[in-house]
């Protein structure tokens, strides 16, 4: 078990702690399958929403917030019934625009896990405007429920007179299936193959700047991030930030990155190269490998 979970575990009820311990092993992927959720519910007698609220301290324990010291946890409920952790992440000494919000982290975790939408997101603090706009891009934005410790409301109640993809004549949505098979790269290198697969699944209907990052760690594990674009532009989540956030959720130390690659479309209106290099430099790790295809 990752040591970050020790303290929040001690705040949980004995039945919940006992049921969780076998699940929080070194292979924990910051998610609970429907079968694991059923086990936790049976052990505690808690219903879905109450159980997610009880688990929030574990999600918040994944937060990396050296600037704000404000630790936010989120749990996204995928349409498959799997629950996905998320936590905010900041980069020490770097511009705040590099930051990943907890809701973005949880949604990215679900998207990378193969989900095509989420039905509910549970968070320990009310979502900021940035996150509300990010969630309004989702395939399930019209029906998404936001669960807080003292409230359960539809996302749309947080966004009166909202702006979204339809205002820019876009019928696609974040987390809807993507297949940008026009991106082609001949390589037998597993890290580049992973980046290519992720880029083909990225979401960039406004710039066509389909892109993905793949990070290889010292222990041999590989984590990818896809570009997630937004109708309001600024809430878009770059692939480097998504890859870093996912790796941290799964217990990696970003100081142990051994290779980092960025693959993007050569036909996009934008490039992720400078942004990715800047983030990587902040980590003091490796040089960015790059290909536009």
UniProtKB/Swiss-Prot annotation:
GO MF terms, alphabetically ordered: cytidine deaminase activity; identical protein binding; zinc ion binding
Domain of life, per lineage: Bacteria
Binding site for substrate: 88-90
Reaction(s) catalysed by this chain's protein: cytidine + H2O + H(+) = uridine + NH4(+); 2'-deoxycytidine + H2O + H(+) = 2'-deoxyuridine + NH4(+)
SUPFAM superfamilies: Cytidine deaminase-like (SSF53927)
Cofactor: Zn(2+)
Enzyme Commission number(s): 3.5.4.5
PANTHER family: CYTIDINE DEAMINASE
Name of the protein in its database record: Cytidine deaminase
Species of origin: Aeromonas salmonicida (strain A449)
